[in-house]
Amino acid sequence: MTILNHTLGFPRIGLNRELKKAQEQYWSGELMIKDLLLVGSELRKKNWQKQKESGIDYIPVGDFAWYDHVLTTSMMLGNIPERHNNTVDSIDLDCLFRIARGCPPDISASEMTKWFNTNYHYIVPEFYKNKVLKYSWKQILDEVDEALLLGHKVKPILLGPITYLWLGKVKGEYFDRLDILKDIILIYKHVLKELSNRSIDFVQIDEPVLVLELPKKWKDAYHYAYKELSGITKLLLTTYFDSIEHNIEFIRDLPVQGIHIDLVHGKYNLKNFSSKIPSEWMLSLGVINGRNIWRSDLLKWFKSIKSISNHHRKILIGSSCSLLHTPIDLVAEKHLDKEVKRWFSFAVQKCEELRLLSSALNDNDIDSIKEWSLPIYERSVSKRVNKIEVENRLSNVLIDKHQRLSPYKTRSIEQNKKFNFPILPTTTIGSFPQTISIRKLRRDFKLGLVTEEEYTKIIKKNIKKVIKIQEELDIDVLVHGEAERNDMVEYFGEHLDGFAFTDNGWVQSYGSRCVKPPIIIGDISRPKPMTIEWSKYAQSLTKKPVKGMLTGPVTILLWSFPREDVSLKKIATQIALALYDEVLDLEKEKIEIIQIDEPALREGLPLRKSSWHEYLSWAVDVFRLSASGVKNTTQIHTHMCYCEFNDIMDSIALLDADVITIEAARSDMELLESFKKFKYPNEVGPGAYDIHSSNIPSVQSIISLLNKAMKYIPLKRIWVNPDCGLKTRNWNETILSLKNMVEATKILREKMKDSECD
């Protein structure tokens, strides 16, 4: 039986980030809606054609989104929060963007969080009791029609109904969100009927929550949902990011026609798994890693798939997950070292890998895949990869270096005496707005168009401006603004040995936000200080403390494309040792507050709780290692993004940061409930306003949020700060927002003084 191939999705941003640029032009009023729609249409055509030319048999349709695919599903279901509704009973792109971004002056955006354990984000669906859901957004049908008209062999993609419900949150009056499953299923049935009328072979229906440890009522919901959806069109139940072996007993009873499994990130005995599922099911094997950039060992996969390919079952081969998480095309990289470039495979090359592998399997000819796999061996013996001096230092790391000199209670007394901050001390998270001219300066400096002297002069001028603004606003703890940094991970990668960098390796994080992850190609070490010059200069401009700003070891690891030949723990420990040296150098230069950001800490958790302990153990260890050399009077801060903290509070506390800042504003301080329950002992900056929205927070809204925070955290341990860095905001928004933040804080301080007098 012929083995066909498919991808689970393709990057949507465009090779030159065309979607990002068009979105931002539309939001700023520089682009008409018809022009934005045209950009989307052209990108879809290019993506479909590129996959077809690369040898993909089934072209995925439904992977394109104007912000994220979960929000697209909310639009399809008519699940629009009332505050975002149009004045007339209709929905449109502006409605979608309001949900994602909010609307000035005071319509808040919906919450945003991480997509499973990736650095991609989605807008969290909001579920309200008695909300009427109805089919409202026909994007999937329109795009299927587009692709069919172009002659493609189409495979529509839908986010599965159970996963959609799992990812959302009940708002307002509580009810069981599974109560609305029936209404959702009616809409899915309508969409599937429409798709069945379009002569497609099957629908890819994504249910990644099947890799989790599900409560019984959610398993029961699967039985109900897929019984209702059966018989309309063929369904390929699609899972990724981990194994579903633990759930196979109920999955195999679902009335679907096939299953996709992630063989890269899930542990499977393929022969055994194949024997457990119905013989008539298609089996789609995710063998090409959709989350990393390394060239695939096609010989390994050839042997594995051959072992079951004569079992008279229809087999598909595909990417492990959507290729959304990888850069688009390696051919666009003109400056990568030739040796290193041969080690990589981006989205287009992964399509070619699928073509090579399916051809080899069908023709029983391995010559082409042998040739493809040669660079994998070359890399294993390259001197760029393993370095004896790094290995030697690693072997001498002792566990007692993973802690501060004294416990927090002792340190806090010494720090309070040293800094004498007022109650509710104010600070920011690190970055300040980056103008077009600053981005151009960095680019020109890299290209050699600007001298180091000119570059340094302009960066220092920017630092001086940032310090002056913060002093005028009367912020207590300052930052230098990070004008020299393109990205909080890439910057450190550029100053560490063991990394490679792309010119165009962009990956979508959320909406128009794209990141360009560095690639960890070998052992990591710090050849020289990375941040000292800028922090030292900033501190020389003010008597107020200026924070040294570092990205933590887990975040550098997880927001890079990591090696696959050594453990993540080993890579993280190498990074921690480099940061340990940097922290001590900052302290020597009288930088007495040092922030080590770990926004990715929770993202790295294995998807199943039973596997959490090992990861959290080393993740905590490497953070503590990086901060372990400083004096009691040196204050260590950390920052975390979009986290559900409830089930990892033990580990958060074990980090032993003197101050943790988090993103609780967008959740209306709900995230602090876990800090209260745990009786978190250290200081907390919960985030006084949401920086991801262009709304200027009012003084009263900030006071309201801080009053809520005081219900969870003792007043003396609360810091006041924006909920994230300010790089993506403009200067006017930033100054007005910070002005209101400081004013709100001063009002509360006066109120506290008055209450003390009373």
Swiss-Prot record:
Any Pfam family the entry gives: Meth_synt_1
EC annotation from Swiss-Prot or TrEMBL: 2.1.1.14
Residues that bind L-methionine: 429-431, 482, 597
Annotated cofactor note: Binds 1 zinc ion per subunit.
A biological process term (GO) from this entry: methionine biosynthetic process
InterPro entries: Cbl-indep_Met_Synth_N (IPR013215), Cobalamin-indep_Met_synthase (IPR006276), Met_Synth_C/arc (IPR002629), UROD/MetE-like_sf (IPR038071)
Alphabetized UniProt keyword annotations: Amino-acid biosynthesis, Metal-binding, Methionine biosynthesis, Methyltransferase, Repeat, Transferase, Zinc
Function: Catalyzes the transfer of a methyl group from 5-methyltetrahydrofolate to homocysteine resulting in methionine formation.
Family: Belongs to the vitamin-B12 independent methionine synthase family.
Name of the protein in question: 5-methyltetrahydropteroyltriglutamate--homocysteine methyltransferase
Protein's gene: metE
